[in-house]
Amino acid sequence: MSIGKNISGFFEKSASSLKSLAKMAIQSRRCDIKPVAAPGESLIVMGNGPSLADTMRDNAEALASHPLLAVNFAINAPEFLELRPEFYILADPVFFNDLTNANVRRLWDNFSSAVTWPMTLFVPAKVRIPVKTGANVTVRRFNPVGVEGFAWLENIAFRTGAGMPRPRNVLIPAIMTGIALGFKTIYIVGADHSWSKTLEVSDENVVISVQPHFYKDNEAEHTRVASVYKNIRLHEIMYSFYVAFRSYFSIRRYADSRGVTIYNSTPSSFIDAFPRRPLKGAS
């Protein structure tokens, strides 16, 4: 039985590896992310989950004394100007394809005028930034190309920036970018990932997915999210969750191979791939 399972696993990894090689050949572009971390310096990656509100209130000193990486609509929150993150990442196509969305337009307006400190913005390699960013914002590119297969192939793809674990959530490219920047210790906050608690199915068989954030989403964002999920079935959403949580284990394996320690500092987070450690006392 174990021999058959091993043979099956080998062919499965072979197929995944070939598929990944083809994807990288077609989709990957040159990236320009270089190590910048000082020796012993730790990075805090901030998801936008509801727990981030408590983290900001209870860990102001840690947040002020570490480089921060923010994601998605965080720049539209009032707290953003206080946090002054050095790094920012956008991955969802909505940020580059829909300037009719008031929240997206406000995001780019903020990148143009609100950032008064040096910041590096990471965006997918193939997108076109729809507006001119401010003088303090430096743009760098990453490849959001999902790579699966043999560990040696994944390691080469991840290390060269040609690909990453399947990026079903912005936190995946965020952590991988932190590793590429040379940080040997990474803390993750605001990564509740408790989406399954908010899933519902209406009497019309419409899946309702509420994804709360530390900031209050306006009605336009609720409408946009509802339209995205309008024709998606529950099994598709659950599979997406599966892919995201599995990707964290790929990150953990790769991080271990690079001597990088990733701590999940999000209270009650559903991510089970990384050891837990409170942000208080972060080195």
Report each predicted region and the residues it spans:
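Metal-ion/cofactor- or nucleotide/acyl-coenzyme-handling active-site neighborhoods
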Residues: 2-283
